[in-house]
Curated annotation (Swiss-Prot):
This is D-aminoacyl-tRNA deacylase. The gene is dtd. It is found in: Cytoplasm. One of its GO terms (molecular function) is Gly-tRNA(Ala) deacylase activity. It comes from Neisseria meningitidis serogroup A / serotype 4A (strain DSM 15465 / Z2491). It comes from the Bacteria. Keywords: Cytoplasm, Hydrolase, RNA-binding, tRNA-binding. An aminoacyl-tRNA editing enzyme that deacylates mischarged D-aminoacyl-tRNAs. Also deacylates mischarged glycyl-tRNA(Ala), protecting cells against glycine mischarging by AlaRS. Acts via tRNA-based rather than protein-based catalysis; rejects L-amino acids rather than detecting D-amino acids in the active site. By recycling D-aminoacyl-tRNA to D-amino acids and free tRNA molecules, this enzyme counteracts the toxicity associated with the formation of D-aminoacyl-tRNA entities in vivo and helps enforce protein L-homochirality. The keyword Hydrolase applies. Homodimer.
């Protein structure tokens, strides 16, 4: 599971259709998280990503140090599904998306990640799965972090959230 985490002071996601645009998620501050799921991802990957999102210390404390977590500051998450995080553009000019999970699996783990974040006491807004969306945000810092749960499987130093 891959997540691009962007610290924001405000963000929204609109669904675009032939009938126009509709805002389906909006937050005042916290993280915009673009979430991609691959074939081998399971609930353990969702737990790892949700735990990291909830506890990453990238918000300033009283001394200006990045020492506070999303939970500490009462921030929100705008969670947006993003299968293109598994694009392979190594050859040719058209990326392959064969590493992205099938829609049913991806949706299940995407929704599970949202519920896990809510279980941490975090307010979560979401995009709409399998739709054309436009994400608007004001990136703060900027702070942008890439998580890949696969790294927990290949690096013995990485801490994995217990079952």
């Amino acid at each position: 599971m891959r997540a691009v985490i962007q610290k924001t002071v405000g963000a929204k996601v609109d669904v675009v259709s032939e009938n126009g645009t509709e805002t389906c998620g909006k937050i005042d501050g916290g993280f915009v998280v673009l979430l991609g799921v691959t074939h081998s991802d399971i609930e353990k990957d969702a737990r790892y990503v949700a735990d990291k999102i909830a506890h990453l210390r990238v918000f300033e404390d009283g001394e200006g140090k990045l020492n506070l977590s999303l939970k500490d500051v009462g921030g929100s998450v705008l969670l947006v599904s993003q299968f293109t995080l598994y694009a392979d553009a190594a050859s040719g000019r058209r990326p392959s998306f064969s590493k992205a999970a099938p829609a049913e699996q991806a949706k299940r783990l995407y929704l599970h990640t949202a519920e896990l974040l809510r279980g941490h006491g975090i307010h979560v807004e979401t995009g709409r799965f399998r739709t054309h969306m436009q994400v608007s945000l004001c990136n703060d810092g900027p702070v942008t972090i890439l998580l890949d749960s696969f790294m927990t499987r290949i690096s013995p130093k990485m801490k994995v959230v217990p079952d």
